[in-house]
């Protein structure tokens, strides 16, 4: 138990990843509590906490360093401090005063900029310039203070969607704007998403295709007849925890493809610009996936070579519960790195944007483009 651990001469607590950040903050900085046994390590005189930056991101010294030490101020840190001060005081940026800065550990900014007014104006303008109605850049307009450049126009765009719904869930409005503003938009669905489909959906679609075979082909298609019987029997005998057969996983993947095509059609994206990559790491039939491999990276790389995009959108909500978003984004970055090593010319005119949606939102201070 806890008392045995506390009796050790030295204790190490290890953690990594964004999903541990909130708990680490409670363990290290929160009150000692029975509900968080690791918080008792605060009483140990030789306890060490080893973290990566993602797990440490909520600690005061990382998130709000101005409260514990002098800072080397840069634009990002100043923006973080002002957003925090607004939330703390309940005031909008332009109403912050010298007193607010002095009473909350931000007097260094007054010394740096001369007054609260000067800091307020700077950060207000910085945040205002992230807001745009032109995610692909506004053609024939001054782009000095816009988040995306005006040229080239139109742009070739790839939106990488880890599952066949993340594109519309997380950046559906942005996707629609890009299409409406005449950019060449491609959507790359990185995984099949098959394990998210329920067995009842498979039964429904099998009833449909069997009925189609009966009505239009007098039930003469033996492949459909055999698969219909085989899959119905399999699902009838299937127990909780049993893995799906490869055929059922394929059908579930087809169902997700149909949903994705419908979404693209609704947003006026030609079906030839819908790319189903079916990255191999995902195809285990289980929640636990395989590690990313060279085969995964090569599939992504081939698409990049084909399209030569000016904009790439990848999932930035890396704390999704299954870890698929992080692996998919890593595959894109690995492919880009390989292209960079080979001196790919298209990369010189390409920008990568990370979107968030279903599992996490960007903090105000970290937003670079809000559409």
Regions from the PLM with identified roles:
Residues 162-180:
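Di-metal (Zn2+ and/or Mg2+/Mn2+) metal-binding site signature of metallo-dependent hydrolases
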Residues 13, 49, 159, 187-189, ...:
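Structural beta-sheet core signal
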């Amino acid at each position: 138990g806890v008392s045995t651990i506390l009796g050790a001469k030295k204790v190490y607590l290890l953690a990594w990843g964004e999903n541990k950040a909130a708990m680490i903050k409670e363990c290290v900085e929160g009150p000692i509590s029975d509900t968080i046994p690791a918080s008792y390590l605060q009483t140990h005189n030789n306890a060490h906490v080893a973290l990566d930056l993602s797990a440490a991101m909520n600690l005061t010294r990382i998130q709000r360093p101005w409260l514990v030490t002098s800072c080397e101020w840069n634009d990002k840190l100043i923006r973080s401090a002002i957003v925090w001060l607004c939330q703390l005081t309940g005031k909008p940026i332009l109403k912050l005063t010298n007193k607010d800065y002095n009473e909350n550990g931000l007097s260094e900014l007054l010394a740096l900029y001369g007054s609260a007014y000067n800091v307020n104006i700077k950060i207000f303008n910085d945040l205002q310039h992230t807001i745009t109605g032109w995610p692909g850049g506004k053609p024939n307009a001054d782009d000095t203070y816009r988040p995306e450049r005006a040229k080239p126009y139109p742009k070739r765009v790839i939106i990488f969607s880890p599952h066949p719904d993340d594109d519309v869930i997380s950046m559906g409005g942005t996707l629609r704007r890009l299409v409406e503003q005449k950019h060449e938009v491609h959507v790359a669905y990185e995984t099949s998403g098959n394990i998210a489909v329920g067995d009842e959906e498979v039964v429904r679609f099998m009833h449909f295709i069997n009925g189609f075979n009966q009505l239009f082909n007098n039930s003469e298609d033996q492949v459909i007849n055999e698969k219909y019987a085989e899959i119905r029997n399999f699902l009838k005998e299937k127990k909780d925890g049993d893995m799906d057969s490869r055929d059922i996983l394929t059908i579930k993947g087809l169902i997700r493809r149909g949903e994705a095509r419908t979404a693209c059609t609704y947003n006026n994206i030609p079906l030839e610009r819908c790319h189903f990559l079916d990255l191999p790491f995902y195809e285990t039939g289980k929640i636990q996936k395989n590690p990313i491999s060279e085969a995964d990276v090569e599939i992504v790389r081939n698409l990049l070579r084909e399209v030569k995009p000016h904009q790439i959108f990848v999932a930035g909500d890396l704390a999704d519960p299954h870890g698929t978003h992080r692996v998919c984004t890593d595959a894109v970055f690995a492919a880009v790195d390989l292209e960079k090593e080979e001196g790919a010319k298209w990369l010189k005119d390409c920008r990568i944007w990370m979107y968030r949606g279903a599992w996490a939102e960007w903090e105000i201070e970290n937003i670079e483009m809000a559409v």
